[in-house]
């Protein structure tokens, strides 16, 4: 029986949607048990005097009745409910909150914009991999939060009174997706961002992370259209032009954009375009979590790990009883190989980190069965929650693990969008060779292998004199590997030193 003392819930009464996250604490991390989201569009119920309409209140209360049933099983001290921009603004917020608290049976805290920004940053820091120095952007329904920080520590926190619902009502109320409406929406957003831009740029960032429905929608569009996962200004401009071509909000059709997200997509896109231009952002990645995760981790008082991906990999190794010595052996070989060919194959630090992760969990499929272990590994990685890894990075890991041995599925390597297909293919080749050379599972059996690569993807494996004759089983595996790689036009040549 699941102990209720291990359960935690976080509820966010946002301007566009109400969200509930229910988790269980497991070995210093969290396991998601439920995510419930309902579009309430509370901000659309505000009039010119900031009075919240009774209809909007009813939509909110109806949603909270759904949430309240799940909360009955969780200790009150382990539930946190916060309200954001619209309920900060509404002059009759107390009327809504009084009934809402009766429905939920627990207090609701209306948090300031700065506190919202801090919680968002905290959620990102606990769930998102990559460099420590970051800029976090969260476009909500009624406000937009911008935060810079390093590691667990937020440095500058800003909350701006603009959101995808308020910008929809202000600039797209006629449902016209013309150039003029977009320009007005963008210009107004740029004027909001401009005063704080110098302070944000002064702190600087190594990575920009987006933690909102707008960014999630962009990610879904890019995956559907086979683009890589990084959001750039040129991609945003392309999507803006596509929206303008559609003409009307009711006729907005972009491959990968769901009907649920379509209504507030143009307004959110306008705000994001303004932020990119005012701050000079080169690219943005999707965050692993935000406000609700910040609330949960705040209740758990768990420290922010320096490397979230390493924590995730360690948890997988423990959970699936992986041979960590063998994983490290394969990883070190792969790192050595990638170092030898990094100049010719242009393998940067990001590529090497993802290859390292794949090596450390490459045997996870054995926990299901030896037969079809690579397919089992890919299935597990596709469907497990992997904090610190983006959806595209998860897909790449699954693809590499599925192609770690036997025949090579070239289309699968082209379908992932974390890295260019050619780069993913090169990582796959290195992983396969590292697994073969480490197959005896002992350090003293690893040969001094040298790799030589060229730009035409010809790869030469140079072995010590007489090694192939002395190691017939691995020699046979390498010969078979040469055939498999050559079959997909990856020339692999085996040589012995003279």
From Swiss-Prot:
EC number: 3.6.1.40
Top EC class, one word: hydrolase
Organism superkingdom: Bacteria
Reaction catalyzed: guanosine 3'-diphosphate 5'-triphosphate + H2O = guanosine 3',5'-bis(diphosphate) + phosphate + H(+)
Keywords: Hydrolase
Pathway of action: Purine metabolism; ppGpp biosynthesis; ppGpp from GTP: step 2/2
GO molecular-function terms, A-Z: exopolyphosphatase activity; guanosine-5'-triphosphate,3'-diphosphate diphosphatase activity
GO biological process, one term: guanosine tetraphosphate biosynthetic process
Pfam families membership: Ppx-GppA, Ppx-GppA_III
InterPro entries: ATPase_NBD, Exopolyphosphatase, GppA/Ppx_hydrolase, Guo-5TP_3DP_PyrP, Ppx_GppA_C, Ppx_GppA_N, PyroPPase_GppA_Ppx
The keyword Transport belongs to this UniProt entry's keyword annotation: no
Disulfide topology: none
Similarity field: Belongs to the GppA/Ppx family. GppA subfamily.
Described purpose of this protein according to its UniProt entry: Catalyzes the conversion of pppGpp to ppGpp. Guanosine pentaphosphate (pppGpp) is a cytoplasmic signaling molecule which together with ppGpp controls the 'stringent response', an adaptive process that allows bacteria to respond to amino acid starvation, resulting in the coordinated regulation of numerous cellular activities.
Protein name, entry field: Guanosine-5'-triphosphate,3'-diphosphate pyrophosphatase
Organism annotation: Serratia proteamaculans (strain 568)
């Amino acid at each position: 029986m699941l102990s209720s003392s291990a359960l935690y819930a976080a509820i966010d009464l946002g301007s566009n949607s109400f969200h509930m996250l229910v988790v269980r604490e497991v070995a210093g991390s969290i396991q998601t048990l439920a995510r419930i989201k309902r579009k309430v569009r509370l901000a659309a119920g505000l009039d010119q005097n900031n009075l919240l309409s009774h209809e909007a209140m009813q939509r909110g209360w109806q949603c909270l009745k759904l949430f309240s049933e799940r909360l009955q099983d969780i200790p009150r001290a382990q539930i946190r409910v916060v309200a954001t921009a619209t309920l900060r603004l509404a002059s009759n917020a107390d009327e809504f909150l009084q009934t809402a608290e009766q429905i939920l049976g627990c207090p609701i805290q209306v948090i300031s914009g700065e506190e919202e920004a801090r919680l968002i940053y905290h959620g990102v820091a606990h769930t998102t991999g990559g460099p420590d120095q970051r800029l976090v952007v969260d476009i909500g329904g009624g406000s937009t939060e911008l935060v810079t920080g390093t590691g667990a520590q937020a440095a500058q926190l800003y909350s701006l009174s603009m959101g995808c619902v308020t910008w929809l009502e202000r600039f797209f109320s006629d449902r016209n997706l013309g150039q003029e409406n977009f320009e007005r929406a963008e210009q107004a957003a740029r004027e909001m961002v401009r005063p704080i831009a110098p302070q944000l740029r002064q702190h600087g960032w190594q990575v920009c992370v987006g933690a909102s429905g707008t960014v999630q929608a962009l990610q879904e569009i890019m995956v559907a259209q086979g683009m890589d996962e990084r959001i750039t200004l040129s991609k945003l401009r392309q999507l803006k032009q596509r929206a303008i071509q559609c003409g009307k909000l009711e006729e907005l059709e972009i491959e990968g954009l769901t009907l649920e997200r379509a209504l507030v997509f143009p307004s959110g896109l306008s705000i994001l375009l303004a932020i990119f231009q005012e701050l000079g952002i080169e690219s943005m990645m999707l965050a692993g979590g935000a406000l609700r995760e910040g609330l949960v981790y705040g209740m758990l008082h768990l420290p922010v790990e320096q490397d979230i991906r390493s924590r995730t990999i360690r948890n997988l190794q423990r959970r699936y009883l992986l041979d960590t010595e063998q994983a490290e052996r394969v990883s070190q070989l792969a790192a050595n190989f990638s170092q030898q060919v990094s100049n010719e194959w242009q393998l940067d630090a990001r590529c090497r980190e993802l290859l390292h992760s794949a090596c450390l969990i490459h045997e996870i499929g054995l926990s299901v069965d030896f037969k079809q272990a690579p397919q089992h590994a890919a299935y597990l990685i596709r469907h497990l929650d992997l904090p610190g890894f983006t959806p595209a990075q998860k897909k790449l890991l699954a693809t590499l693990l599925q192609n770690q041995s036997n025949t090579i599925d070239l289309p699968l390597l082209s379908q992932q969008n974390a890295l260019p297909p050619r780069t993913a293919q090169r990582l796959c080749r290195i992983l396969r060779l590292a697994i073969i050379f480490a197959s005896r599972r002992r350090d003293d059996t690893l040969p001094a292998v040298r790799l030589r690569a060229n730009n035409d993807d010809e790869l030469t494996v140079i072995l010590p004199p007489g090694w192939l004759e002395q190691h017939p089983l691995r020699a046979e595996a390498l010969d078979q590997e040469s055939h498999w790689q050559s079959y997909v036009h990856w020339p692999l040549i085996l040589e012995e030193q003279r």
